[in-house]
């Protein structure tokens, strides 16, 4: 079986949602947030440094952000534009102060677990300026406090590390989480127990899809789900 990481996380979110998107081809666009635009510009920042070996100016990033914003302007009010600029400046100032050295931005990966092929893209990888070791960087943009318990268990981090660590020459077990809005930071790591958990999760998802287990996950997220009017749980 072949799965993208998006399919995997959609199934975890709600098996019924997976069924609508990938079996019944009911594809609904997820509402775009201003943080999505900021994140695109941050990835551009990483790619620019990797390609040109120098830091782009804040004006370059602001121009990139403005072009993205104008393309989807009807989706946002004017206050969101200002909010995005604030986040972008925060990121730029922090990255320059940290002398952030990116190794990759959204590196593609293919991971084999038994007869299951998982395809996806990792979070950006940066080089720690003190230890000179690799670590994943996960940027957050909301105003909420970092949920350390959630971050310590986050499956995406385990998946990234497991996929990257297939390379015998490099190892990453550390993930730096940076909240750009409130400047909070948290370091988490992964070990063999985390890798066993993500492998087991992938196998369970594969079995669920093969056996057509597409029940709705009724819960607090249902009210904001774009598929709620299609879902039998709401009929």
Predicted features and spans:
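Short, intrinsically disordered, charge-biased short linear motifs at domain edges
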Residues: 1-4, 204-220
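Nuclease catalytic cores
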Residues: 6-51, 84, 106
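Cysteine-cluster motifs in flexible loop/terminal segments that predominantly coordinate metals
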Residues: 12-19, 211-235
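A residue-level signal for conserved active-site and pocket-lining positions in enzyme catalytic cores
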Residues: 14, 38, 42, 124, ...
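Short helix-capping/linker segments at secondary-structure and domain boundaries
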Residues: 26-27, 46-54, 96-98, 165-171, ...
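Hydrophobic (often cysteine-bearing) scaffold residues that line and stabilize catalytic clefts
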Residues: 34, 38, 80, 84, ...
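A non-catalytic, helix-rich entry segment at domain boundaries
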Residues: 40-107
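Mg2+/Mn2+-dependent nuclease catalytic core
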Residues: 103-201
């Amino acid at each position: 079986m072949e799965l993208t990481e998006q399919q995997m996380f959609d199934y975890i979110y709600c098996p019924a949602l997976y069924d609508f998107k990938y079996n019944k081809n009911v594809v609904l666009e997820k509402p775009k947030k201003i943080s999505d635009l900021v994140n695109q510009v941050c990835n551009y920042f990483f790619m620019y440094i990797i390609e040109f070996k120098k830091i782009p100016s804040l004006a370059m990033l602001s121009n990139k952000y403005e072009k993205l914003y104008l393309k989807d302007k009807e989706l946002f009010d004017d206050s969101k534009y200002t909010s995005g600029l604030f986040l972008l400046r925060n990121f730029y100032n922090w990255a320059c102060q940290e002398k952030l050295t990116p190794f990759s931005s959204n590196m593609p990966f293919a991971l084999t677990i038994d007869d299951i092929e998982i395809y996806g893209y990792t979070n950006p990888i940066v080089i720690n300026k003190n230890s000179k070791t690799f670590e994943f960087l996960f940027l957050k943009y909301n105003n909420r406090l970092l949920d350390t318990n959630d971050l310590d268990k986050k499956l995406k981090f385990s998946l990234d590390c497991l996929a990257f660590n297939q390379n015998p020459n490099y190892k990453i077990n550390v993930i730096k989480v940076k909240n750009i809005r409130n400047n909070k930071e948290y370091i988490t790591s992964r070990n063999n127990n985390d890798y066993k958990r993500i492998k087991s999760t992938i196998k369970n998802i594969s079995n669920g899809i093969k056996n057509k287990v597409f029940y709705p996950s009724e819960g607090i997220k249902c009210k904001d789900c774009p598929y709620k009017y299609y879902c039998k749980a709401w009929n």
